[in-house]
Amino acid sequence: MTEFIFLVLSPNQEVQRVCFVIFLFLYTAIVLGNFLIVLTVMTSRSLGSPMYFFLSYLSFMEICYSSATAPKLISDLLAERKVISWWGCMAQLFFLHFFGGTEIFLLTVMAYDHYVAICKPLSYTTIMNWQVCTVLVGIAWVGGFMHSFAQILLIFHLLFCGPNVINHYFCDLVPLLKLACSDTFLIGLLIVANGGTLSVISFGVLLASYMVILLHLRTWSSEGWCKALSTCGSHFAVVILFFGPCVFNSLRPSTTLPIDKMVAVFYTVITAILNPVIYSLRNAEMRKAMKRLWIRTLRLNEK
């Protein structure tokens, strides 16, 4: 097996051209929107807290995560043959799970940061010092790498000697398992256990952290409630949008479903574009910092 053929979103050529314009616009918005958040955090002194440090890494992860699939999809929508080499498929699969796994760990780290900020405010700067923040980000990277490496290692044990048509627009685990001509039962269980355990346990830890935060907020005033919920609301919205499809994929049956491609579009493209929208619209400090960055840029252009 030297290559795989993708079945993109629609066989209709006109629909593919429309999808090309839509996904090109969405991917451009993902890169520009998330890069704007990274640039704003890096250049704004008012956004020097660990929360924004983690947010800048999350935005960078969103760019990388969507870049694992979106550019190939966009180019395939105009190509006659939607093909990818075997090694290209493995690389796409690795980076998709590497960046996706890293993002899951990073979202969990951000939940811990919110927990410390709300439940232990007096010790926040001591607990969440820059050395700890750097280590936590490093753990997220290592965790994502180990998750992806395990998935790829399992795929390498499969034999592909028959059909090479993938009923998807990128290399994903379930479609590849269906093409294997060797026994996939045990490997399939290990793949589901690896990805499912990461998604479900991380989501459970996130929910538990927010339950503890809500219990802690019972003694706060209404003003404190509003401030705390404003701090956590954006992160919780991103968590729900990201983990919803992940949990669905982990708990769904192994059969191919008609909505699989739409769900994949949601967790590879839509969530990445919603991240800058959610954080810029709900966070007053971020909006002010972006405004100051825009004013500084205009002044530099005038000079």
Curated annotation (Swiss-Prot):
Keywords: Cell membrane, Disulfide bond, G-protein coupled receptor, Membrane, Olfaction, Receptor, Sensory transduction, Transducer, Transmembrane, Transmembrane helix
Keyword field contains Aminoacyl-tRNA synthetase: no
Predominant localisation class: membrane
PROSITE patterns listed in its UniProt record: G_PROTEIN_RECEP_F1_2
Disulfide bonds: C89-C181
Side of membrane Extracellular, spans: 1-17, 72-92, 151-187, 251-261
A GO molecular function held by the record: olfactory receptor activity
Any one Gene Ontology cellular component term annotated for this protein: plasma membrane
Domain of life: Eukaryota
Sections of the chain in a coiled coil: none
CDD domains: 7tmA_OR4A-like (cd15939)
Topology term for the membrane: Multi-pass membrane protein
Cell compartment(s), UniProt: Cell membrane
TM helices/strands, residue ranges: 18-41, 50-71, 93-112, 132-150, 188-211, 228-250, 262-281
Cytoplasmic side: 42-49, 113-131, 212-227, 282-303
SUPFAM superfamilies linked: Family A G protein-coupled receptor-like
PANTHER family: OLFACTORY RECEPTOR (PTHR48002)
Purpose: Odorant receptor.
Family classification: Belongs to the G-protein coupled receptor 1 family.
Name of this chain's protein: Olfactory receptor 4X2
Organism: Homo sapiens
Gene expressing this chain: OR4X2
